């Protein structure tokens, strides 16, 4: 303190409020006014304050659009997501239809449900597929005390599709699924990851988990993992989730990712 006395005194002076400074304003003039969203958003974009921009849009809403921009925006809106065309696979032969659909489309969203969030320790509980918007399936292989398909038979059935380089595999954090499948003898090929795409495009703008991306890009609130398994003392393993509930959750994951 003795050595830096001068700096300490300067710092004290800098933080001392001048209560004698003339303020020629009426208190009513300090009342919070309506934000000029367009002006605020323009400034935040110019300064590249992406996190603040995201927070501002969340607080004040989307900016006003011109007529042409509004028309473009309306054409980009997705149809509401429904689970009416989500299917629970109870016969292994039903998988053939989904394989054929994926091969014809040349792309398929793939998602795995497991017993653990650590892919190295996880056991496969189910697989969801989607090659057409609004249509997805869930293949249960590891739900406890419930009728599931034989895991080895399902893996053998899907192996050629998942390793086919001519069919693009789309995933959200697909590294997780890659590890799960690799442990079962499948090496995924031709992969694209929506989480990585989001990070490359908007690294600091928002979070890149599926729930956030669905809300931003599709205007759809997804079923959260916690809604399915619970929290705290009431939390259960995904392998204990009822098949119908698991189907709606897992198929939605694949559909939203696609």
Question: Where do the PLM segments sit?
Answer:
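Short, solvent-exposed helix-loop connector elements
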Residues: 1-3, 23-34, 235-246
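Accessory alpha-helical DNA-binding modules that contact the DNA backbone or grooves
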Residues: 1-12, 21-24, 66
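Generic hydrophobic alpha-helical scaffold/packing signal
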Residues: 2, 15, 41-44, 57, ...
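Short coil/turn segments at secondary-structure boundaries
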Residues: 12, 16, 24-31, 54-58, ...
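Charged catalytic cores and adjacent phosphate/nucleic-acid-binding surfaces used
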Residues: 12-13, 48, 194
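Non-catalytic alpha-helical coupling and interface elements of nucleotide-dependent molecular machines
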Residues: 16-22, 45, 49-65, 202, ...
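Long, highly charged low-complexity segments
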Residues: 26-127, 141-145, 150-161
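Active-site-proximal helix-loop-helix substrate-binding element of RNase H-like nuclease domains
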Residues: 80, 118, 122-258
């Amino acid at each position: 303190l003795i050595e830096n006395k001068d700096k300490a005194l300067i710092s004290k002076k800098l933080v001392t409020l001048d209560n004698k400074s003339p303020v020629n304003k009426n208190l009513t003039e300090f009342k919070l006014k309506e934000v000029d969203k367009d002006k605020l958003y323009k400034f935040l974009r110019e300064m590249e304050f992406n996190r603040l921009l995201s927070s501002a849009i969340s607080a004040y809403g989307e900016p006003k659009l011109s007529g042409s921009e509004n028309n473009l925006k309306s054409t980009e809106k997705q149809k509401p997501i429904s689970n009416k065309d989500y299917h629970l696979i109870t016969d292994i032969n039903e998988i053939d239809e989904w394989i054929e659909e994926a091969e014809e489309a040349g792309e398929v969203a793939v998602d795995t449900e497991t017993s653990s969030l650590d892919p190295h320790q996880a056991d496969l509980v189910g697989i969801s597929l989607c090659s057409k918007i609004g249509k997805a399936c869930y293949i249960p292989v590891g739900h406890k005390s419930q009728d599931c398909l034989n895991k080895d038979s399902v893996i053998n059935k899907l192996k050629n599709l998942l390793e086919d380089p001519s069919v693009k595999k789309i995933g959200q954090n697909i590294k997780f699924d890659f590890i799960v499948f690799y442990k079962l003898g499948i090496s995924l090929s031709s992969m694209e990851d929506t989480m990585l795409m989001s990070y490359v495009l908007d690294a600091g703008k928002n979070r890149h988990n599926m729930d956030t991306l669905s809300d931003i890009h599709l205007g759809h609130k997804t079923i959260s993992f916690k809604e399915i398994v619970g929290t705290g003392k009431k939390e259960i393993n995904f392998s204990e989730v009822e098949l119908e509930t698991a189907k709606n959750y897992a198929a939605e994951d694949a559909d939203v990712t696609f």
